[in-house]
């Protein structure tokens, strides 16, 4: 792959992958041919920063988890929020404990959402490479058959 396409891939992956993932991805791209660029741009990478913003503004309702694609965990956030609100009407001490636990999970989830989106993006990239290698093998086998 030529250096212009590698630079373009590097720009696309800039904030989408961790540093180690980006280095590994660029090393793997060096062996590919330039014809994959149109299909590479079709990969729907999610932004970890957008996930953090969703979590910051709608995190109490599972916004960051829904953005990441963890629907069940987003639903659990909604259920937990409702339970914390119900605890508020019964007992103040129970509410304080439930709210403290909810805030701790909410805070830890900032890190987990950010790293999880980067990991999901890397997995999408690996699946893309696997598909590209498979389709190249199929083409070469079809060419050999003729």
Report each predicted region and the residues it spans.
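A short amphipathic helical element positioned immediately N-terminal to and/or at the very start
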Residues: 53-67
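Transmembrane helix recognition focused on a "late"/terminal membrane span
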Residues: 1-55, 77-146
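Select subsegments of transmembrane alpha-helices in polytopic membrane proteins
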Residues: 72-75
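Juxtamembrane helix-break-helix junctions at the cytosolic face
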Residues: 63-70, 88-90
């Amino acid at each position: 792959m030529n250096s212009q396409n590698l630079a373009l891939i590097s720009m696309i992956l800039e904030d989408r992958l961790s540093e180690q993932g980006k280095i590994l991805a660029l090393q793997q791209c060096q062996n590919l041919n330039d014809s994959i660029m149109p299909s590479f741009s079709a990969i729907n990478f999610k932004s970890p920063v957008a996930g953090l913003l969703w979590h910051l503004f709608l995190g109490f309702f599972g916004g960051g988890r829904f953005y990441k694609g963890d629907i069940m965990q987003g639903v659990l956030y909604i259920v937990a929020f409702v339970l914390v609100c119900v605890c508020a009407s019964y007992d103040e001490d129970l509410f304080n404990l439930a709210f403290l636990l909810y805030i701790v999970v909410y805070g830890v989830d900032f890190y987990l959402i950010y790293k999880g989106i980067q990991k999901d993006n890397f997995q999408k990239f690996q699946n893309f490479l696997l598909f590209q290698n498979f389709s190249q093998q199929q083409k070469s086998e079809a060419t050999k058959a003729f």
